[in-house]
């Protein structure tokens, strides 16, 4: 079993092209030129949500770096554009430029004493209230360029733009971006289900800090609801499921199915169900997402009551299937392909059926 904080995941193949009709590729942006004074006013009035949105990275700039930004404002040095996303309620979230925005607000609220200035050295050690009235006005009147991606934009194009702007030293994982764009009751439920003891035991207990656990839960819910209708790209499929259900929590029945599925998988495989077997016969360190699809969905549609007494046979058949060349293709490369998605779930379900475990798996097109 893995230790806390050590869970790792195999990533999908190279990013897939978006499947958005030409006429629907709508991206609406609105540029604004705001003074620093207007910026702080918007933060105070919660027009701009700062450091209160779960996806946003922590404030990591030290005082010296923040001070140099303030010095740039005073010297009229150009400041890079800041990008925001507009929510349905009209509020803005910082997508790119959080460190800059937060540093400016800190200074105007006397939460930053300048240090390490190389040009305006006489201001070192001073807070905003301690600099001259002239310098205060220079800072407050300095204009910043904001670009807002409005709520009118097509959600998949919007997601793609966020990925392009995702240029930090450690880029946001796909579900960290979803956590920003699709905040609501459904997203909250994903977090709750990812903490379920049954799920933690099924995947090996390791807690992933990049929200990949929540993405695994999302995969289950989205595919369980519409496996036969699945089509790639998988990122877009998951995005659409979150967008459509943003303000709705999954039904108690679906949550119960998820919990029961993970309980049975955990008890049978002891945290190794979603890991392929390496050449030396040991389970891989990484969680294989394609194998997760096959195992979790097959169990979800199976008659779990028929499993009792067959646990060892299931483990043996599972290991044999992992050596099957066709199944290896289904969980190997290009795993988001519709045929391979359906193929791996169908083949695993057939394995369970061969052990007299009935299944209600919906019809899956061959191609």
Model-predicted segments: where are they?
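Short amphipathic alpha-helix initiation/capping segments at coil-to-helix junctions
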Residues: 210, 251-258, 284-292, 307, ...
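Basic- and aromatic-enriched surface patches that contact anionic nucleotides/nucleic acids
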Residues: 2-41, 50-243, 308, 315-320, ...
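Amphipathic alpha-helical interaction surfaces
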Residues: 107, 223-227, 244-247, 268-271, ...
């Amino acid at each position: 079993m893995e230790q806390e904080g050590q869970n790792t995941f195999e990533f999908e193949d190279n990013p897939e092209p978006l499947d958005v009709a030409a006429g629907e590729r709508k991206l609406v942006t609105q540029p604004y030129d705001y003074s620093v004074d207007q910026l702080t006013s918007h933060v105070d009035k919660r027009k701009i949500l700062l450091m209160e949105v779960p996806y946003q990275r922590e404030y990591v700039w030290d005082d010296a770096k923040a001070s140099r930004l303030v010095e740039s404002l005073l010297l009229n040095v150009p400041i890079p554009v800041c990008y925001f996303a507009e929510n349905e309620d009209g509020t803005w979230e910082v997508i790119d430029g959080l460190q800059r925005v937060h540093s400016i607000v800190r200074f105007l609220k006397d939460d930053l004493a300048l240090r390490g200035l190389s040009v305006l050295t006489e201001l070192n050690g001073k807070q905003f209230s301690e600099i001259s009235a002239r310098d205060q006005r220079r800072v407050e009147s300095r204009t910043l360029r904001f670009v807002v991606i409005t709520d009118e934009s097509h959600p998949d194009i919007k997601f793609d733009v966020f990925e392009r702007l995702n240029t930090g030293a450690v880029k946001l994982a796909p579900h960290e971006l979803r956590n920003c764009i699709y905040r609501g009751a459904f997203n909250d439920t994903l977090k709750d289900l990812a903490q379920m003891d049954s799920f933690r035991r099924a995947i090996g207990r390791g807690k992933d800090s990049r929200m990949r656990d929540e993405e695994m839960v999302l995969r289950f819910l989205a595919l369980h609801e519409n496996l036969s209708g699945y089509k790639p790209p998988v990122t877009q499929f998951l995005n659409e499921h979150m967008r459509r259900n943003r303000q709705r929590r999954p039904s108690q029945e679906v949550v119960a199915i998820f919990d029961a599925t993970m309980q049975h998988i955990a008890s049978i495989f002891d945290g190794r169900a979603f890991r392929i077997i390496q050449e030396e016969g040991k389970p891989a360190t990484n969680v294989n997402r394609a194998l997760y699809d096959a195992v979790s969905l097959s169990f979800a549609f199976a008659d779990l009551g028929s499993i009792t007494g067959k646990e060892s046979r299931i483990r043996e058949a599972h290991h044999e299937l992992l050596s099957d060349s066709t199944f290896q293709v289904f969980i190997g490369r290009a795993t988001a392909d519709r045929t391979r998605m359906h193929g791996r779930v169908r083949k695993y379900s057939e394995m369970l059926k061969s052990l007299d475990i009935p299944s209600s798996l919906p019809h899956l097109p061959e191609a």
